[in-house]
Regions:
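A charged, aromatic-enriched C-terminal amphipathic alpha-helix characteristic of glycosyltransferases
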Residues: 17, 344-374
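Conserved catalytic-core segment of nucleotide-activated headgroup transferases in glycan assembly
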Residues: 21, 191-196, 202-260, 265-279
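Membrane-proximal helix-turn-helix segments that form the acceptor-binding/catalytic region
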Residues: 92-97, 131, 145-165
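Acidic donor-binding loop of glycosyltransferase active sites
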Residues: 103, 163, 278-292, 303-306
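Active-site proximal beta-strand in glycosyltransferases
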Residues: 118-136
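Carbohydrate-associated surface elements
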Residues: 171, 188-191
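Short hydrophobic beta-strand element within catalytic cores of glycosyltransferases
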Residues: 296-302, 306-310
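Conserved acidic donor-binding segment of nucleotide-sugar-dependent glycosyltransferases
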Residues: 322-330, 338-344
Length: 388
């Protein structure tokens, strides 16, 4: 089977979370014998500047540098047709040409799926989350409200155009089936490439931590809950406990309304998310609201790091082995204290977490539902009417 995968970003080994998931998926598809062609857009303002990182050299990835539209045009597109920037670039013609040789086309994320109407092959849109579950929809005169409304409009437009939709959790699939009743919705676990996460975390240090992008609403609400409620309870039982916080924008100044607490170290942006996670003995992620599988949780599993989180934090995970999942802040704190205090318990939980990764989120098992979806799509023989 010939599959064209369209990415709106370069799948870099040390790129963002979406890049690492894309690599895991591509390795799984290749392992199942799929004849892959990968077309990745690299939107940039400076056309002389290459991607900041390395592409996997053993995967058939065609990187397409495209100039970012002018800021005035981008602002207009955000109003007129959100998430459609790639439609105003030469990437459009590349997608059309490469799709001619494919049995199935797989668009990753909304910003790529904006091109779904341009191909005449069975095509699937992959989405990781739903805006209404991730953030409050504020008034349009606020920046947060405008962003949320733009995302909702993009979702509505692209879901309407998609006959097949791919998600990573039942919690996203069920509401999506109501939003897009005409579409076939498939759930497949998110995979990661285990080679990126070797060696595993030693778990020697009794240190808790969390990594994420500070401005992303689910991360922001987890940090607020962590520092207002969970970490103070940990300190009551273990005054010498340490908490490491890292990620883009993860600076003390970004959260001026939160208390200063002992043992908290703000790392900010780190060179390698994987290396940061290897420092931890526990991933502590008290997420209150957020949809889809969380990459930081998957990465902790792949590294064999025990996880203490909520049901939303564990969404899309194939098994709870190696995780403590609870909604109560006191219970989350108790579980964290127990793991910090007992090296053997950390090792046992870490081994169980790694087994969960291998059984459910390694490339081959995680992509089995995707292979089945491709076969179903190809068997229909349906060709979409394309835009002129």
């Amino acid at each position: 089977m010939r599959v064209l995968v369209v990415l709106p970003f370069p799948p870099l080994v040390e790129g963002g979370a979406a890049s690492r998931c894309a690599i895991g998926m591509l390795r799984g598809l290749a392992g199942h014998g799929v004849e892959l062609q990968v077309l990745a857009a690299h939107l940039r303002n400076d056309m002389l500047e290459g991607p900041k990182g390395d592409l996997p050299d053993d995967l058939p990835i065609e990187l397409a540098p495209v100039a970012h539209p002018r800021s005035k045009q981008t602002r207009w597109l955000r109003f007129a047709k959100p998430s459609s920037v790639l439609e105003r670039t030469p990437f459009v013609q590349l997608v059309r040409e490469r799709a001619r040789d494919a049995d199935v086309v797989h668009f990753v994320e909304l910003s790529a799926a904006t091109l779904i109407h341009l191909v005449d092959r069975p095509a699937v849109t992959q989405v990781h989350c739903l805006t209404r579950r991730d953030r409050a929809i504020g008034p349009p005169w606020t920046s947060e409200g405008r962003v949320a409304i733009e995302l909702l409009r993009a979702e509505r437009r692209i879901f309407k155009q998609s006959r097949w939709l791919l998600v990573n959790s039942r919690e996203v699939a069920d509401p999506l089936a109501k939003i897009a009743p005409h579409a076939h919705v498939t759930v497949a676990p998110l995979p990661l490439d285990p080679a990126i996460y070797t060696p595993r975390a030693p778990l020697d240090a009794p240190v808790a931590g969390l990594i994420g992008t500070a401005e992303w609403p689910p991360t922001a609400n987890a940090i607020e809950r962590l520092l207002k409620s969970v970490w103070p309870r940990v300190l009551e039982r273990r005054p010498d406990a340490r908490l490491l916080l890292a990620g883009f924008g993860m600076e003390r100044e970004a959260f001026p309304h939160l208390p200063d607490l002992p043992g908290v170290e703000w790392r900010g942006t780190v060179p390698s998310a994987t290396d940061f996670l290897r420092e931890l003995g526990v991933l502590l992620y008290p997420l209150g609201r957020g949809s889809g599988a969380k990459i930081k949780v998957l990465e902790a599993l792949a590294l064999g790091v025990p996880i203490v989180t909520t049901p939303d934090g564990a969404e899309g995970i194939g098994s709870y082995d190696g995780l403590v999942v609870d909604t109560d802040d006191a219970a989350l704190a108790d579980a964290t204290v127990a793991l910090l205090a007992d090296a053997q318990a950390r090792q046992a939980a870490g081994a169980a977490a790694y087994d969960t990764f291998c059984n459910h989120h390694a490339p081959l098992p995680a992509t089995i539902p995707l292979i089945e979806l491709y076969e179903q799509m190809a068997a229909t023989g349906i060709r979409r009417p394309t835009a002129a």
